[in-house]
Amino acid sequence: MASLQASRFMLTTSCSSCTRTRSAISIPKLPKFNVSIPQIPIKNRNFRVEEPILRLDGFAEDLDLSLSERQRQKKRGCDDQVLQRSRLMAVLEEVIDRVEMHKNIGEQRNNWNSLLLNSVNMITLTAALMAGIASMNASGIDSVSAVSIASTVLLASATGLAALMNKIQPSQLVEEQRNATRLFKQLRNRIEMVLREKSEDGISEEDVKEAIKRVLCLDKAYPLPLVGTMLEKFPQEFKPATWWPETKPEPTHSRTEANGWNSELEMEMREVVEVIKSRDAEEYEKLGNVALKLNRVLAISGPVLTGIAAVSSGFIGHGSGLAGVVATTCASLAAVVNTLEHGGQVGMVVEMYRNSAGFFSLMEDTIKTERRENGQVFETKVALKLGRSLSELRDLARRSSLSRFDGSSWSKLPSDLLNMVFERLGFADFQRAKSVCPSWLDASRQSASKNQIPWLIMFPEKGFFGDIPRQIFETQVNYDVLANGVRRVRPELGNVFHIKNTHLVVTMTGETLRVDSIIRSDSDVWSFCIYQMDSSNSKWEKLTSLGDEAILLDQGITVLANAIEGVNRNSIYFSGVQFQYGYVSSEKDICVFNLNTQKVERPYRNISSFIQSCDARWFVPNITRT
């Protein structure tokens, strides 16, 4: 810097001694100086260092390190954290105060319930006793009038007190304050946990706003005053309690494996929500509606009975003993009704169901919104709140998924859609679809099963070939014979007259038939007996005719014969090898048993002679319309 100042001084002196012959003053250029500023080791990387700026009056160093600005921002941040912490502490103080208030008011209203119940019952029973005495002592007119008037006044007072008591439902008020005390204690623990966990990171304004919202929601769900803000005790519809603020679900991309969430856990939580919605919540809402209706009936019956007793007691001593009977009976019944309603605390039961239904709604909302809590911790909390272990919770979710997959959701399909499905099914699939569930069975009765043309398949002696080239599919035919190594012989089993087989056949209308087939042991003569179940006595009755249907015994079904060319009505189609016993010549026979003539026919001899087959089967192809 000393050298710089010296150069500047020399420059000024030379300028003053210049000649005046020139018209302009020429200021010489300043020499260039390479000024190197040593690098200072700085730990804080937030400092900003700028190069010196040359000005007319010299060099002006601008080393803006913004240290003071950073300090001011840090101070403002600390002040904001202190402010938010103070606000949250103020909310905590209000929560603690509300815990004590709801606890004290709950005890007070519990005293109301017991005192009012005892007072109303004592007044009612005393008035009933006085009405009975007045009706017995009808000879003394003056004394009867006095006792009757006193009884009327007492019963009228009991009517008013009972109506007031039924209006406010003290037992329900007590349960409201119990729930409010418990929930405010939970909120207090929640705020204290936030204050502990965020002592270093700092409390945000969102934490304060959320705490305030929860306080206001609890105040709305469980109000302290009776006038103006008291909850409706007899609403038209039972609704669960709601004491939590509405939350928005967080985006799916925030779910990470590192936070304990995975696809299996998310699926498990969704199944738990379905169980809560379909089973627990519906059950408690149903029970709540029943308790609400019962409480409404009891609340109306008590004052009505005491009112009738009060009116009847006013007519005691006027020449009729019926007034005394009505007064004493109604007053006694009123005491019983009041004891059942308030001694049994039916209002408390209604509030308990309302709070329980609200709890399941809260669980459903909590799982759906999925606050970004660790997945495993969240699963543990859900299991404990539902009163289950982790293994039981996972088993519940798995069984719920399987039950919905197995048919509970299929049973809710609309009938129009089911009819469209049934129209595209073959006969066999149509019969299978009917057995899925009762709703499908009802829908199948509106849809006629599709009548298909039966096909006949022939099994060649040397194999079964199809459309696939150079492929032969072997089949095996079993024989019940004894062999001597050279030829088959029929075993001598004694005097065997019949061999009877029983088959079940499903008709076009879905009814079940029993078909007994009979064959002689020494011939190929068949006969059949058909039986139908009588639903009135659950016994099989013999059926003589199939009408326009024909039985395909190989498939166990019937087809509509008059709609298919070449199929005879009131007949049974079968292959002879199924019923053969020791008689070989008819293995490849394709037979028809006519129920009208009771004879077996072989209408397809030309097919049997053309194809060297060892067996034949009737079947209905499963060709569906798309």
UniProtKB/Swiss-Prot annotation:
State the UniProt keywords alphabetically: Coiled coil
Coiled-coil regions listed in the entry: 171-200
Cited SMART domains:
FBOX
- Lineage, top-rank taxon, reads Eukaryota
InterPro entries attached to this UniProt entry: Chloroplast_duf (IPR027949), F-box-like_dom_sf (IPR036047), F-box_dom (IPR001810), KIB1-4_b-propeller (IPR005174)
Q: Does the keyword Coiled coil apply?
A: yes
Q: Where is the F-box domain?
A: 407-453
The name of this protein is Probable F-box protein At4g22030
Organism the protein comes from? Arabidopsis thaliana (Mouse-ear cress)
Organism lineage reads as: Eukaryota, Viridiplantae, Streptophyta, Embryophyta, Tracheophyta
